[in-house]
Swiss-Prot record:
Keyword Cell membrane: yes
Superkingdom as given in the UniProt entry: Eukaryota
Subunit structure as annotated in this protein's UniProt entry: Forms a heterodimer (via N-terminal transmembrane helix) with SLC5A2/SGLT2 (via TM13); this interaction enhances SLC5A2 transporter activity. Interacts with PDZK1.
Function statement: Auxiliary protein of electrogenic Na(+)-coupled sugar symporter SLC5A2/SGLT2 and SLC5A1/SGLT1. Essential for the transporter activity of SLC5A2/SGLT2 but not SLC5A1/SGLT1.
Compartment(s) of residence: Apical cell membrane
Protein name, per record: PDZK1-interacting protein 1
GO cellular component: apical plasma membrane
Organism: Mus musculus (Mouse)
Length: 114
């Protein structure tokens, strides 16, 4: 085995180095830039796709809406027959499905000029 290895090494040392083929020529600078931008955009698209599928959060079971029986309204899981006390302060006395627009105090409202 050692003799075969030395024979191959000797033959490779005696052979003249191969001449590489010359390319068709350098690309124009605008073409190099166009290719670079296209490759960059493809890489960014791949990163966004991986991020979208990898970092997807599962919906919390408490915030999912399910319909039970013939009920027309969606009911939060575990909230059947209960209501939010926060919404009772906004209810209108004119209609059961209407809400009042509560005016905020002037100091608490932040407005910016356009």
């Amino acid at each position: 085995m050692l003799a075969f290895s030395l024979l191959v090494l000797g033959l490779l040392a005696e052979v003249a180095p191969a001449s590489c083929q010359q390319g068709l020529g350098n690309l124009q600078p605008w073409m190099q830039g166009l290719i670079a931008v296209a490759v960059f955009l493809v890489l960014v698209a791949i990163v966004f796709a991986v991020n979208h599928f990898w970092c997807q959060e599962e919906p919390e079971p408490g915030s999912t809406v399910m319909i039970i029986g013939n009920k027309a309204d969606g009911v939060l899981v575990g909230m059947d027959g209960r209501y939010s006390s926060m919404a009772s302060g906004f209810r209108s006395s004119e209609h059961k499905n209407a809400y009042e627009n509560v005016l905020e105090e002037e100091g608490r409202v932040r407005s910016t000029p356009m």
